[in-house]
A protein has these predicted regions:
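Glycoside hydrolase catalytic-domain context in secreted enzymes
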Residues: 1-622, 640-644, 649, 738, ...
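Enrichment for repetitive, rod-forming helical segments
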Residues: 24, 159, 688, 698-699, ...
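Terminal connector regions
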Residues: 621-668
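N-terminal, non-catalytic alpha-helical interaction modules of very large eukaryotic scaffold proteins
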Residues: 727-730, 734, 738, 742-745
Length: 798
């Protein structure tokens, strides 16, 4: 295979080539001035750059340069606006080049398997098509300025608990249809130059060294020609990763990674021509993105313009969930009581590696209400974040509520509820907030709850309030965007990217999530989110794709042909509004189990009062396909398909059908062997049926009784060594302190979920792999042997 940069590579020594495959430091690749190879800088940035000014660290403990804090991915996904996603991506890139950033580590598009995942605020959707389309838009925007996007985390990375020591056990059809389709769209349509592998194993093999994922799917099938980077500290066997399709381990590991590669080349397990090919692919992106940052040096980005874009993005993404008696929009002069700590101190972004230092002080409702035309009769805090109910604060809030025309209660999830490194344990809002809403509705019937949260929540007070408006995490301009919606300056058009179940116990993965042992079994298979609820007919609070407007829309004139669907939408209300029409496809089959319907397209249409438009949604290569594990390829089953246009996943307003000549006459599944999967009732799939679906023996993920290098630090509690138990105990105390303070301790969370070998990957070579092995021995109670091993390894370290 010819190499684009073969002339450079052939001049390099084996050690120099090997050194290039690990980072120079936390954020940059190795540079070689004598070969003209520049360093390539990476930065977190799914919804805003986190370029650190001083010494870099993965968790953002050191301050980052000011950057626009856009709404998070979960927020923007509610807009269903690909053009908006591309605009945000372009703005992110414009900021990146002024900060000498070549690669933006985002967007994140893991599937929202469960509402409890702590990073759901960073991810687009529970649906892979929706997630993929939004991600591709971001990628196009970012790469339009000559730098690289880096979709993450590839793949089946659905929980934060023990995320670096977890094995996602998932059948191949589910893996392809649900957990990789979004990445496929981002790669094929967005032309992403890089991909970040996930921390977890997939069917027993770490993602960063999984040949099936990185070579057979990513390169051979999708045509990916960029580079793969490990998640920070996520490289397990560096040489095996390079052999199987990975390129770059981050952060830098000193000379440890270089020695691993050199050793593998010399012992024949990594052919040097494979190393050369990986280096060539990496250099292609290094050189391709270099000029953009050279051109951007010394330039400034449009702070005001990007702030305005952040507001526009938040406005398009607000979801109106309830509007009884048209309590909204609020008319000028309405006397409102503003209740809730979130009105004064907004929660506008999530916590973790995506934390942004905004260019402007984030707006609060109290900052913007003065220009709204409303009359604020009182503001009361009502509750203390992450604390038990406060009777005095609640009493003052209730008194204020008595004298208002409308009460605006600002509520949601606090900082400790959603963060990288932890998962929620329930779907409740804090007790203090729920009790406060109950008390206020007892004295005033005109209550509107304004929510801030990055994932779905339970709403026990739903029947007692007249309005519910959800802003998700709206970024630095989220408050003015929300006020514009509340007062009718903006007509709400957002629709939910995820289902809101009535109770967490109703969710399809309830019995399987999160995994406490190493194996995380995806027994619910295809039935994620609305695919489950619609198939079994389970009632939900709000379906996927749901959202109200201040106007109304009528659908008519459905036409279906081989190319797609055409229909008419009319604005039948009194104000201009935007509707998001959704295309769903379903098929009954005796030999292939399927959800009753799946999203296959969508259109965002803006209409003036009385205006109507003809809308066309085209079919594509994903409309009718399923992954056939008999042929290990995508197939289309012949037969009659139901073609549906809906306002959300539950409400189909136009229904047609189409006969499709497929590639196979039937599937290879049996109702007798897989009865639960054909019915969709997958709440308690037994081992026999799951083994049939999985196609192999289900791995035993239970702990072996001995601490291993790839066991998480949180498992040291079970070890025999006193030092390991003490370290675990200290971490637990620190976690409790952070919970009490109401802010996640990212450093502690990272350590808590990290495997022991992670210390050899995250300390820049200070801890070697041999030292990590010695620590493992000590954790198993071999104190003398382990200490001696540790000393020897430390002496040999260079």
């Amino acid at each position: 295979m010819s190499l684009k940069y073969g002339e450079i590579i052939k001049q390099m020594s084996l050690e120099e080539k090997a050194l290039m495959m690990s980072g120079k430091n936390t954020w940059e690749t190795v540079d070689f001035e004598k070969y003209g190879i520049p360093s390539m800088a990476m930065s977190d940035g799914p919804h805003g750059l986190r370029r650190q000014a001083g010494a870099g660290d993965h968790l953002g403990l050191n301050a980052s340069l000011p950057a626009t804090c856009f709404p998070t991915a979960a927020t923007i996904a509610n807009s269903w606006d690909e053009k908006l996603g591309e605009e945000i991506g372009t703005a992110l890139a414009e900021e990146a080049v002024t900060m000498d950033v070549n690669v933006i580590l985002g967007p994140g598009l893991n599937i929202k398997r469960s509402p409890l995942c702590g990073r759901n605020f960073e991810y687009f959707s529970e649906d892979p098509y929706h997630a993929g389309k939004m991600a591709a838009a971001y990628v196009k925007g970012i790469q339009s300025k000559g730098i690289s996007a880096c979709p993450k985390h590839f793949a089946a990375n659905s929980q934060e608990l023990r995320r670096m020591a977890s094995d996602s056990v998932v059948d191949e059809r589910t893996f392809r249809e649900i957990y990789t389709t979004g990445f496929e769209i981002a790669v094929k349509e967005g032309k992403s130059k890089s991909i970040m592998s996930s921390y977890n194993e997939v069917n027993g093999v770490y993602a960063n060294e999984n040949r099936h994922m990185l070579q057979e799917i990513l390169v051979d099938e999708w045509g990916f020609d960029g580079y793969v980077v490990s998640d920070w500290g996520g490289s397990n066997d560096h040489a095996l990763g390079v052999m199987n399709g990975s390129h770059l381990e981050m952060p830098g590991t000193g000379k440890s990674g270089m020695r691993d590669i050199v050793r593998a080349v010399k012992d024949g397990t990594l052919p040097e021509e494979v190393l050369d090919q990986r280096l060539d692919e990496l250099l292609n992106v290094v050189f391709a993105t270099h000029q953009a940052t050279v051109d951007g040096k010394g330039k400034k980005f449009d702070v005001e313009g990007h702030h305005a874009l952040a507001r526009k993005a938040a406005e398009e993404s607000v979801v109106l969930l309830k509007n009884s008696n048209n309590i909204l929009p609020l008319k000028p002069g309405t006397k409102v009581a503003v209740i809730g700590d979130f009105a004064k101190t907004p929660r506008y972004q999530g916590a973790g590696s995506s934390l942004v230092n905004p260019t402007k002080q984030p707006e609060s409702i109290l900052d913007v209400i003065g220009d709204s035309g409303l009359v604020m009769t009182a503001y009361e805090q009502g509750y203390i974040r992450n604390r038990k109910p406060n009777a005095a604060l609640a009493k003052s809030a209730v008194e204020a509520a008595k004298n208002a025309d409308v009460v605006l209660v600002f509520a949601g999830l606090d900082e400790i509820s959603e963060s990288e490194g932890l998962d929620r344990t329930h779907m409740h809002m804090p007790q203090a907030q729920n009790e406060l809403i109950d008390a206020i509705t007892a004295v005033n019937t005109n209550v509107v709850v304004v929510l801030s949260a990055g994932s779905s929540i339970e709403m026990p007070w739903f029947d007692y309030v007249k309005g519910i408006v959800h802003g998700y995490l709206g970024g630095q301009a989220g408050a003015s965007a929300m006020m514009n919606v509340l007062t009718g300056k903006v007509c709400p058009s957002g629709k939910l990217n995820e289902t809101y179940p009535l109770h967490y116990e109703d969710t399809p993965a309830f019995h399987y999530y999160p995994s406490k042992e190493r194996s995380s079994e995806y027994r619910e298979a295809l039935y994620v989110g609305y695919r489950y609820y619609t198939t079994v007919g389970k009632k939900v609070r709000f379906p996927f794709g749901y959202g109200l407007s201040y106007t109304t829309f009528a659908y008519s004139n459905l036409s279906v042909d081989k190319d797609g669907v055409t229909f008419t939408i009319k604005n039948t209300g009194d104000v201009e509004g935007t509707e998001i029409a959704q295309l769903y496809v379903g098929k009954q089959s005796e030999t292939i189990f399927r959800p009753v319907r799946e999203l296959k397209g969508f259109a965002r249409v803006t209409l003036a009062p009385g205006e109507e438009k003809s809308v066309h949604i085209a079919f594509d290569d994903k409309t009718f396909r399923f992954y056939d594990t008999r042929t290990n390829t995508w197939e289309v089953e012949s037969g009659n398909y139901q073609i549906m246009v809906g306002t959300d996943a539950d409400t189909m307003v136009l229904v047609g059908s189409l006969d499709v000549a497929g590639t196979v006459a039937e599937g290879g599944y049996s109702k007798e062997i897989l009865p639960e999967y054909f019915s969709g009732k997958i709440e308690n799939v037994d081992d026999i049926e799951y083994r049939e679906l999985y196609g192999r023996e289900i791995p035993d993920g239970s702990w072996s009784g001995e601490i291993q290098m790839n066991d998480a630090v949180c498992q040291l509690y079970y070890g025999k060594g006193i030092f390991g138990k003490l370290f675990y105990g200290v971490l637990r105390i620190l976690l409790k302190i952070s919970e009490w303070q109401g802010k996640p301790n990212l450093n502690v969370l990272f350590n808590y979920n990290m495997p022991i070998r992670g210390y050899a990957k995250m300390t820049g070579g200070f801890v070697t792999m041999e030292m990590a092995r010695a620590l493992t021995e000590m954790a198993n109670g071999h104190r003398i042997k382990g200490t001696a091993h540790l000393i020897r390894a430390a002496v040999k370290r260079d």
